[in-house]
Amino acid sequence: MNPERQETISPKNVPFQPVPTPNQQSLQSRMLESNQAVPDAFQKVAAWNHYNAVATPPIGVPQTARPPSNQSPHPNPPGYPYQSHQQQFHPLAIAFQQPFGLPQQVIYPPPPPGFTPHRVQVSPVGLLGPPGFFPQFAGSTTSQGNPSEVSVRTKSAEGTTGPIAPSITTKPTSTIQVAPPRDPVAPTTSSSGITKKPENGEFSLVKTISGHTKSVSVIKFSYCGKYLGTGSADKQIKVWNTVDMTYLQTLASHQLGINDFSWSSNSQFIASASDDTTVKIFDVISGACLRTMRGHTNYVFCCSFNPQSSLIASAGFDETVRVWDFKTGLCVKCIPAHSDPITSISYNHDGNTMATSSYDGCIRVWDAASGSCLKTLVDTDHAPVTFVCFSPNGKYLLSAQLDSSLKLWDPKKAKPLKYYNGHKNKKYCLFANMSVPLGKHIISGSEDGRILVWSIQTKQIVQILEGHTTPVLATDSHPTLNIIASGGLEPDNVIRIWRRN
């Protein structure tokens, strides 16, 4: 065994034990009833995990143990029991995290290249809405796809990635070229107007930005307001200057598409979540990848820095929440949080609690320190929840569901206070935003190519922004200025900047 490869174990006082899948549970029961020893296959799986566990050094220390990027980091060790990666269950998917006295958690590697993960758990009856409904993502046993061509977020819940017929009436009428960016695959920036003159107090399209080669899956302004980050199914995150929307940096290290990313509070780092099952930390200025965190056994769909930027929480299709130490990259907590893929995770303003949403129809609020579940929010329709975030003051939650609705929750009362309707959202996981600088508004994209702005108080639509020709997956509002950024599915994979007059 390579002496540089070491087993990395999370603290033993983590209070949560992962729930085995039905197949695993029945296997454990049969083994205990017959008083048999641990099967040889499980011993080999444990050896495989030990063989691939890598202790990553603190940020700033060279990661000499990592193999070159052009070499496979996961050669089959001697005695590896599963020679085919195309069978139904990969050993990383069936190896439960505390099998028969083994350490509570080993930081597992991602599946070997070319392997398409499969779901192994069955959802509780009735939690996914209408009978027979199930999100048809690439990670599902009912759907196959080429994950290298799209990210999970840009894939429809019905298993299609094609655009939905838009109803667009307003389109750019002029294009002004600006100076080319620095690198040879230069993103280009243009300034555009719209066909009708906007009224005072309304948003208008002021700029379009081209740079990504595939669908734009996530857009977020930095906390300082100086930068705009955009993530895509093309495996890259790009950083732009918000003053003139010129290109600054490309963050490229992931092997598959980007589903989400989070800015650190000082706007110097970005944590990213990808289909390649890893979470990475990037230095925004240099563009260097400082850390790769391995542990998730399926697509990582969402991630979030805590307000202190000392921890990163991530979640995804393995239905667990993992909390990572920013400085060391070690997993300090693993929570089996939901019974279906987790679609978003958010810390409140003080970092004491975090919220998660899932296709199981539940929103859960967690104590960030202990990992205990404080509250479970479920509405009567049980629609799959695709997004959740705390309000700026931390008192409320905003959620998005696959029933074309947004809901404002009071976590203490465990029920929705207000409903926001008017957009179309039946297939994709769309981001939504609460904007105080813009006048206490809620902003969301729509699958018909529009962006809707609601009044938080009155629930009325105050403006509809038209310009995209495909579903708008990602929106965000500037922390201090009256600016909205939006992006959507290819072929209309450009970023649009909207400003209020």
Swiss-Prot record:
Amino acid composition bias (Polar residues), ranges on this chain:
22-35, 167-177
Q: Which GO terms describe its molecular function?
A: dynein complex binding; microtubule plus-end binding
Any one GO CC term of this protein is: nuclear envelope
Q: Which GO terms describe its biological process?
A: brain morphogenesis; establishment of mitotic spindle orientation; germ cell development; microtubule organizing center organization; nuclear migration; retrograde axonal transport; vesicle transport along microtubule
Please give the InterPro entries that the UniProt record associates with this protein. G-protein_beta_WD-40_rep, WD40/YVTN_repeat-like_dom_sf, WD40_repeat_CS, WD40_repeat_dom_sf, WD40_rpt
Consequence of gene loss (knockout): RNAi-mediated knockdown does not result in detectable defects in histone H3 'Lys-4' di- or tri-methylation in embryos or adults germ cells at 20 or 25 degrees Celsius.
Listed Pfam families: Beta-prop_WDR5
Ranges of the WD repeats in the UniProt entry:
211-241, 253-283, 295-325, 337-367, 381-410, 422-455, 467-499
Q: Where is this region: Disordered?
A: 1-35, 58-85, 155-197
Q: What function does this protein fulfil? A: Not required for methylation of histone H3 'Lys-4'.
Family classification: Belongs to the WD repeat WDR5/wds family.
Q: What name appears for this protein in its UniProt entry?
A: WD repeat-containing protein wdr-5.3
The UniProt gene name for this protein comes to wdr-5.3
